[in-house]
Amino acid sequence: MTDKTLYQFNYSQDIVHLQTVYSLFNRVSNIIFSVTFDEGFDDTLMTNAIQLLMKRNDCLRLKFVKEGKVTKQYFEAERYIGEIPSLTFRTNCQMYSFIRKFRRKAIDVRKGETMNVVYATDPTGNRM
């Protein structure tokens, strides 16, 4: 299994876990969060800020494993987000279509996913 120290879920995690186990699609919906910049967006600086967020925030370094029928968790010492895709949308219809598809894509916490980050440029040229 793993040589890491495993922890039981706390009550609020247990509620979310039970929602995923007993829901129709076995997942919790993605919560779309975006920040729009009309000037001065630096991909490298933002990627470094996200890396720092993952380093300092324990919940972004959680990893889940099954031990028998019970799901447990442990903390990874280091976590890296990798390369962040950058998209450019020509029309609002194209952008909203992508957002609808992205929102429906499940985050698989058992594979270590905690968040999906995408850089984008909207049709007016603003960076997100």
Please report, for each region that a protein language model flagged, where it lies by residue.
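N-terminal beta-alpha "docking/capping" segments at the starts of catalytic domains
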Residues: M1-D43, N48
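Acyl-thioester-dependent condensation/acyltransferase catalytic cores
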Residues: Q8, T47, M54-M128
